[in-house]
Amino acid sequence: MAKNTAIGIDLGTTYSCVGVFQHGKVEIIANDQGNRTTPSYVAFTDTERLIGDAAKNQVALNPQNTVFDAKRLIGRKFGDAVVQSDMKHWPFQVVNDGDKPKVQVNYKGESRSFFPEEISSMVLTKMKEIAEAYLGHPVTNAVITVPAYFNDSQRQATKDAGVIAGLNVLRIINEPTAAAIAYGLDRTGKGERNVLIFDLGGGTFDVSILTIDDGIFEVKATAGDTHLGGEDFDNRLVSHFVEEFKRKHKKDISQNKRAVRRLRTACERAKRTLSSSTQASLEIDSLFEGIDFYTSITRARFEELCSDLFRGTLEPVEKALRDAKMDKAQIHDLVLVGGSTRIPKVQKLLQDFFNGRDLNKSINPDEAVAYGAAVQAAILMGDKSENVQDLLLLDVAPLSLGLETAGGVMTALIKRNSTIPTKQTQTFTTYSDNQPGVLIQVYEGERAMTRDNNLLGRFELSGIPPAPRGVPQIEVTFDIDANGILNVTATDKSTGKANKITITNDKGRLSKEEIERMVQEAERYKAEDEVQRDRVAAKNALESYAFNMKSAVEDEGLKGKLSEADKKKVLDKCQEVISWLDSNTLADKEEFVHKREELERVCSPIISGLYQGAGAPGAGGFGAQAPKGASGSGPTIEEVD
């Protein structure tokens, strides 16, 4: 396989997944724990940084410094209502840095703060490493997916996270579109089909309607909620049980981060159980002040707790149908994507909405997005496999884009659901006589007045020659690239003077310098992680050597071949090292290596003398090279004859 392989990464709110297209098919790659999805968690401890399963597994012990949900922060402002409401549920601290949210944690004994892009970049680095371990060579090219309903700043911030992780982001593509590729790739030649992708994940919800016809995937409309998913169902369960605990035990656990985290983990498990059983039990020992919490919940009660959220998933479905100008009967396939679509009630609501139509569950809801991203990555790298070479993706802009005209009116140049890439030009003029310049303010959203929409950026076109109002002609061009990221240019026709802006949300966007700095920091963290790995390996090697020596001299088979004095010398030294290890677990690699050499100086002559004297190599399971047998990194095992 050529070294210029590109990977597809589904960077999820709660879990991420990576795939690669090679030899004509997609492989979803398992991580070092054998899991095909990896938690989007990053944990900081006194000694190290953990990413993925390792981070999620220790979350109850370290809730304040374990960061997740970075996708719910990325590209948003600190003052956003959703950020403020999420902060109530998060055990980690979110601080305000010039209206940008930053996550504050304790790492190696000092307080550190990170932008959401940095946290996401750590997860991306992990996914990149998972792919590299599988492929056996470095990987830099990647396609990363985002919810279709992500706005410009969220897309741009996700792209920045990729850059910080050392990736060359070939393209940002929409999750439902990627899932549609996974669905439609093997279904060519069936004529034109209208497909509705219903994608309900851990933190985001998208609905997209596509027409798939012989390798052409054309998105007709998209709708969704970038803040609805499995986490919100977990939150409802957590609140329910916090109240139940209050009723039963007259105690409020909501301020105890560790108790709430243990409860949340149990709720997540119960929620999954309720997709296949009608009842789930929670058993948490010593949840709070020594009180054991044993309780249960029925599926009906869970559905009742989340009923408004579940019903709310149908609004975007209706909106997408309206925008695509289709009615229910015109949809051929209803495809479920995202782990939360396993919830029976969600399936039933969708099925009833489409008058009892069967839902298509043929693709893996956890892996479909990464699968499609991997296919798109291969196409962008020029893969010539027959099943992808004719594939064409036509995606859309999720929100209308325009600028503010006199009186604060929103004038849209690009309507929502326009196929991208696209370019629209319109001519504007001045509002007052001899106006020397115009302020171009770019907004996204569907409301009539700009104050109700989202300001993406603003720039000035100055130096307009004096003229009566309405005479100067200013040509404004909106150009959206294939990533859904916008460039705006304004030109004064009389002077040819132009000014342009890549909408990079001056307020929300990281500057080039910041990104550079973060790239270097990411490298540094990676180096620190490696030092930590080497340190642990040296510690394990010392520990296993000490125990091996101890068991070697205690071996019954050596009675009479080893003087008591020598035996005592080895045992005392081993015991000394083992005690030293217990009280110096955080020593440097060099100290472990030094201790080991010290131990070898005592043991080697005795052990090798023993085997030469005994003339019986291999006695007690050690070859003549016994001391070196344990010198690999990490614990080693000896074979016993």
Curated annotation (Swiss-Prot):
Cellular compartment(s): Cytoplasm; Nucleus; Cytoplasm, Cytoskeleton, Microtubule organizing center, Centrosome; Secreted
CDD domains, per database record: ASKHA_NBD_HSP70_HSPA1
Modified residues (N-acetylalanine): A2
Keywords for this protein: Acetylation, ATP-binding, Chaperone, Cytoplasm, Cytoskeleton, Methylation, Nucleotide-binding, Nucleus, Phosphoprotein, Secreted, Stress response
Segments forming a coiled coil: none
Modification sites for N6,N6,N6-trimethyllysine: K561
Top-rank lineage group of the source organism: Eukaryota
Cellular component annotations (GO), alphabetically ordered: centrosome; cytoplasm; extracellular region; mitochondrion; nuclear speck; nucleus; perinuclear region of cytoplasm
Chain positions with Phosphothreonine modification: T636
Residue numbers bearing the Omega-N-methylarginine modification: R469
PTM sites of type N6-acetyllysine: K77, K108, K246, K348
GO terms of biological process kind: DNA repair; lysosomal transport; mRNA catabolic process; negative regulation of cell growth; negative regulation of cell population proliferation; negative regulation of transcription by RNA polymerase II; positive regulation of microtubule nucleation; protein folding
Pfam families for the chain: HSP70
Spans annotated as Disordered: 618-641
Subunit text: Component of the CatSper complex. Identified in a IGF2BP1-dependent mRNP granule complex containing untranslated mRNAs. Interacts with CHCHD3, DNAJC7, IRAK1BP1, PPP5C and TSC2. Interacts with TERT; the interaction occurs in the absence of the RNA component, TERC, and dissociates once the TERT complex has formed. Interacts with METTL21A. Interacts with DNAAF2. Interacts with TRIM5 (via B30.2/SPRY domain). Interacts with PRKN. Interacts with FOXP3. Interacts with NOD2; the interaction enhances NOD2 stability. Interacts with DNAJC9 (via J domain).
Family, similarity comment: Belongs to the heat shock protein 70 family.
Entry protein name: Heat shock 70 kDa protein 1A
Lineage, top ranks: Eukaryota, Metazoa, Chordata, Craniata, Vertebrata
